[in-house]
Amino acid sequence: MELRHTPARDLDKFIEDHLLPNTCFRTQVKEAIDIVCRFLKERCFQGTADPVRVSKVVKGGSSGKGTTLRGRSDADLVVFLTKLTSFEDQLRRRGEFIQEIRRQLEACQREQKFKVTFEVQSPRRENPRALSFVLSSPQLQQEVEFDVLPAFDALGQWTPGYKPNPEIYVQLIKECKSRGKEGEFSTCFTELQRDFLRNRPTKLKSLIRLVKHWYQTCKKTHGNKLPPQYALELLTVYAWEQGSRKTDFSTAQGFQTVLELVLKHQKLCIFWEAYYDFTNPVVGRCMLQQLKKPRPVILDPADPTGNVGGGDTHSWQRLAQEARVWLGYPCCKNLDGSLVGAWTMLQKI
């Protein structure tokens, strides 16, 4: 059954039956990720004239945050390299490291070092942020899409639960300001983005999956003319924090709350102080400048230079049109035809 035809009372079952990855699927994707991580750490930069060491590989995206949708087998792997010693280095040199990773992948394929097939895709831009490829193997029932992103290890040995040194953000803000590239280095803070969502209640992650599924359904009509999916994930967290904060809640009410927030996109101004705050004058000034921007403003909790909600009001208008239509579907209604009702928000919008 499609989501739009699913009664509100059955949304939890819909998530369980259609959106939660099963154990076999999760194991397969994990195996694929392990293959690529091993390649990056053990093989990729061996034998190069100028030794390059991989300091760590961090799993980002849905698989890192624990919000993967069933059937969508993709993984973001951020590769932190010792040769990238600044934000400027990352911007200037990531292209050469992407080329080297690609060269080694193709060599592995020719030598059949791994029992996998790499179908390397051509980069679509001059200075790509990522190398995209598809990994397939007789052991895997389906292909897994990868984005591998070389990055500068700005955080170093960061301990979960602690705020990074504000000076890291001061350097980030200076670099972004001088280049006019806000949010350009968000990959450096993948661990924080992952940490922000990772330990949330299971049911909130299920609601995020539902919202992502709705977003993907809308994308079939509008293509890439919608706001970033990450903005919808953060909007869902905000809805839960402001409207519920319970580990057990009505999924239908949560879903309706997110749809209604999309309708109010012109009033949204959302930020968190989990990893940075107003204490440091440079960071505080950057945050205030961001919060004065035209709505919607949804600041990346890991990167004060990244307003993931901004940039294109038309994209939000398209999504709002969809939200208005979806509020009339059974997934938002009680048996008597009335709306299930959104959560009462602590912060009025």
Curated annotation (Swiss-Prot):
ATP-binding keyword on record: yes
GO biological process: antiviral innate immune response; defense response to virus; interleukin-27-mediated signaling pathway; negative regulation of transformation of host cell by virus; negative regulation of viral genome replication; regulation of ribonuclease activity; type I interferon-mediated signaling pathway
Oxidoreductase keyword on record: no
Protein name: 2'-5'-oligoadenylate synthase 1
A Pfam family of this chain: NTP_transf_2
Cellular component annotations (GO), alphabetically ordered: cytoplasm; cytosol; endoplasmic reticulum; extracellular region; membrane; mitochondrion; nucleoplasm
Impact when changing residue 65 to A: Significant loss of activity
Species of origin: Sus scrofa (Pig)
